[in-house]
């Protein structure tokens, strides 16, 4: 089988590097690298929930996605300068939010909010899938932080891991984890978000340059899910290390009666 321009086989991911504790202030901070794509993912904990969520006893999770002006080869203006978010930015922010809410019991948070921020430092295709994969690790660290602070009603509110990967048809071949060079000329382009329990969270797929058969869809999903298994292993390896920051001291346990 012939190799791709970057030397990979069709089913191979780019090198994946997950660095926890990349910045100090958030409860969770992760730099994730999919090859040349680099995304900083942070998870911040704040007391309270949106107004429409108050008095429910439920927590909330929201996410924002953005790209640095120089993340691509040509600098672009910050969207804050333009005065409005692009449709793409809003779409990806909502995708990250939906993906992570699929794995957490919001009731366990109490009326607290976890805010996920994903900032693309360097873009070479697959920024949204890298953001989701890295944001899960940041979320897991934020949950550890909340648990140490005694703010969780359930010490294990995460029901599964979440990862995402791009897959597509390029030059008539099914390939996974497309860099920009492949993504820009793909006949079929798809993003798959999955759990480590074998279920799917979201599938975004389009025939960019051609229609595709049901059998091709099945092959795309098979390759994407196989790649997600590799990403889950990378997440587990990263999270096997100790929490990278200083954990808060929770409230003391209640005294036993008569002591």
Curated annotation (Swiss-Prot):
Molecular functions (GO terms): 3'-5'-RNA exonuclease activity; tRNA binding; tRNA nucleotidyltransferase activity
Major enzyme class: transferase
Family classification: Belongs to the RNase PH family.
Gene3D superfamilies the record matches: GHMP Kinase, N-terminal domain
Entry-linked HAMAP family: RNase_PH
Its biological purpose: Phosphorolytic 3'-5' exoribonuclease that plays an important role in tRNA 3'-end maturation. Removes nucleotide residues following the 3'-CCA terminus of tRNAs; can also add nucleotides to the ends of RNA molecules by using nucleoside diphosphates as substrates, but this may not be physiologically important. Probably plays a role in initiation of 16S rRNA degradation (leading to ribosome degradation) during starvation.
Keyword Ribosomal protein: no
Pfam families registered for this protein in UniProt: RNase_PH, RNase_PH_C
Subunit architecture: Homohexameric ring arranged as a trimer of dimers.
Name recorded for this polypeptide: Ribonuclease PH
UniProt-listed Enzyme Commission number(s): 2.7.7.56
UniProt-annotated binding residues for phosphate: 88, 126-128
Recorded catalytic activity of this chain's protein: tRNA(n+1) + phosphate = tRNA(n) + a ribonucleoside 5'-diphosphate
UniProt GO BP: rRNA catabolic process; rRNA processing; tRNA processing
PANTHER family in the cross-refs: EXOSOME COMPLEX COMPONENT, EXOSOME COMPLEX COMPONENT RRP41
SUPFAM superfamilies: Ribonuclease PH domain 2-like, Ribosomal protein S5 domain 2-like
Keyword set, alphabetical order: Nucleotidyltransferase, RNA-binding, rRNA processing, Transferase, tRNA processing, tRNA-binding
Signal peptide boundaries: none
């Amino acid at each position: 089988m012939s190799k791709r321009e970057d030397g990979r086989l069709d089913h191979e991911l780019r090198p994946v590097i997950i660095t926890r504790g990349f910045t100090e202030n958030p409860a969770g901070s992760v730099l994730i690298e999919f090859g040349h794509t680099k995304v900083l993912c942070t998870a911040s904990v704040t007391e309270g929930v949106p107004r429409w969520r108050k008095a429910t006893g439920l927590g909330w999770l929201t996410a924002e996605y953005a790209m640095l002006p120089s993340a691509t080869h040509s600098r672009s203006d910050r969207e804050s300068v333009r005065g409005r978010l692009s449709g793409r930015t809003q779409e990806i922010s909502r995708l990250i939010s939906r993906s992570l809410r699929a794995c957490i019991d919001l009731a366990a948070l109490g009326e607290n909010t976890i805010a996920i921020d994903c900032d693309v430092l360097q873009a070479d295709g697959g920024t949204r899938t890298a953001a989701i994969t890295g944001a899960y690790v940041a979320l897991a660290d934020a949950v550890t932080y909340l648990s140490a602070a005694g703010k969780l009603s359930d010490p294990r509110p995460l029901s599964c891991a979440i990862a995402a990967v791009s897959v597509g048809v390029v030059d008539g071949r099914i390939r996974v984890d497309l860099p920009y060079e492949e993504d820009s000329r793909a006949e079929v382009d798809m993003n798959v978000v999955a759990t480590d329990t074998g279920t799917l969270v979201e599938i975004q797929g389009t025939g960019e340059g051609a229609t595709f058969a049901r059998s091709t869809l099945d092959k795309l999903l098979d390759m994407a899910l196989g790649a997600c298994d590799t990403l889950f292993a990378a997440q587990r390896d990263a999270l096997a290390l100790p929490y990278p920051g200083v954990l808060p001291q929770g409230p003391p346990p209640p005294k036993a009666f008569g002591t």
